[in-house]
A protein has these predicted regions:
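Glyoxalase I/VOC metalloenzyme domain signal
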Residues: 1-33, 41-187
């Protein structure tokens, strides 16, 4: 899989305990300075890591977590962000070269070399990470186009967005808007 792991940072550490009180199937459990963290695998096989820490190095493995009382009105996480994505790539040097042209994404995309036929297939072939949409403050589309070179697939005629593909065939959509990042999966 192209998507190695989604790392989610929650605003309220206590909410992680509320989630754990529901006794989900977890693959790893940790204790950090702010509270507990855990890793789980989605039905689609995606690994999701949930934490509230400023520094992941502060996490220590746990065998189990005490169950807490969950407020009746707790429905789920109230506020969280995708901290970063671990993306599996077939050729680490090639992927690093591509992403070195996009320093604003360095905090979001952590590359790791892996093996597998599915790491370079098109989005329509497999259920996996297919697109990362980056909304920026108004930008000069020609500057981004020049940085990305031949990887650019489409430039909107009004210059408000462009689409490029990384070496793993993940589409990167750059759109003039609000400095946000969206992640999509293809079925």
């Amino acid at each position: 899989k192209k998507l190695g792991r989604i790392v989610v940072k929650v605003a309220q550490a206590q909410e992680i305990d509320y989630l754990l009180a529901r006794q989900p199937e977890t693959t790893a459990l940790y204790q950090g300075a702010k509270g507990r963290a855990f890793e789980a695998v989605s039905p689609q096989g995606d690994t999701i890591f949930v934490h509230a820490e400023e520094d992941l190095k502060s996490l220590a493995p746990l065998d189990s977590a005490p169950l807490v009382d969950v407020p009746e009105d707790f429905k789920g996480l109230t506020s969280f962000d995708v901290d970063f994505l671990e993306v599996n790539v077939a050729d680490l040097a090639e992927a690093e070269k591509f992403y070195s042209n996009l320093p604003a994404l360095a905090h979001l995309i952590h590359l790791q070399e892996a093996q597998g036929e599915d790491l370079q297939v098109g989005n329509h072939v497999t259920w996996d990470l297919s697109m990362i949409k980056v909304e920026l403050a108004p930008f000069d589309v020609e500057v981004v186009k020049e940085r990305l070179g031949e990887t650019v697939d489409f430039v909107h005629r009004k210059g408000t967005f462009l689409i490029a593909k990384d070496p793993s065939q993940i589409e990167l959509w750059f759109e003039a808007n609000q400095d946000q990042v969206h992640i999509s999966y293809e079925e």
